[in-house]
């Protein structure tokens, strides 16, 4: 088994047979079946409406931040669509996971490993450059716009108001 999730199902139901618990190994590449969730859109959408892609990414960043700050509530939501046994099990599975989308070197490497496997097995027909395909400009722009908005909001909070002044 490549994840604790399937190990739990196997233990609870006996429907899945574990051959090896790869989560015991320190090498993260052995657990690449846990490829990070990939957010995609069509090439046409990216070219014709980049502002919509950036707006969507801003929403995904906000959702990730919320999930990081509210892991129990996030676990309750995610439990409805995962293979975990229950909300507590889901929480244990996500409590150390950063839910904010990112294009870290490790995430790109994990996607590359998954892509190479799917290419070798014939699930995808055309090879491609994962770093270029990831289109980092959308996530970067979304992060920049969110930061600019947060800075502007903080500046506005520091401006004194004239409310309540007499004379």
Give residue spans per PLM region.
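Short loop/turn and capping residues at structural boundaries
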Residues: 21, 89-91, 129-130
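Residue-level preference for alpha-helix termini and adjacent loops
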Residues: 38, 44-45, 98, 102, ...
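Pocket-lining segment of extracytoplasmic ligand-binding domains
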Residues: 1-81
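Conserved C-terminal helix/tail region of periplasmic/extracytoplasmic solute-binding proteins
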Residues: 119-167
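Secondary-structure end/capping motifs
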Residues: 47-125
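Short secondary-structure boundary/hinge segments and terminal tails
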Residues: 8-10, 27-29, 96-98, 134-138
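Short, structured secondary-structure boundary patches
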Residues: 20-22, 39-43, 109-111, 142-151
């Amino acid at each position: 088994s490549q994840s604790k999730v399937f190990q739990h199902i196997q233990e609870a139901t006996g429907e899945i047979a574990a051959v090896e618990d790869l989560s015991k190994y320190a090498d993260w590449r052995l657990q690449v079946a846990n490829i990070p969730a990939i957010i995609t859109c069509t090439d046409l959408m990216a070219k014709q409406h980049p502002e919509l892609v950036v707006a969507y990414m801003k929403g995904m960043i906000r959702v990730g931040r919320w999930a990081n700050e509210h892991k129990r509530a996030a676990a309750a939501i995610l439990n409805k669509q995962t293979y975990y046994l229950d909300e507590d099990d889901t929480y244990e599975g996500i409590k150390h996971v950063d839910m904010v989308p990112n294009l870290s070197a490790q995430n790109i490497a994990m996607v590359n490993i998954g892509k190479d496997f799917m290419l070798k097995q014939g699930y995808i027909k055309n090879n491609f450059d994962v770093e270029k395909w990831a289109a980092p400009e959308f996530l970067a722009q979304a992060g920049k716009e969110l930061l600019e908005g947060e800075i502007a909001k903080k500046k506005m909070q520091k401006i004194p108001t004239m409310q309540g002044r007499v004379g």
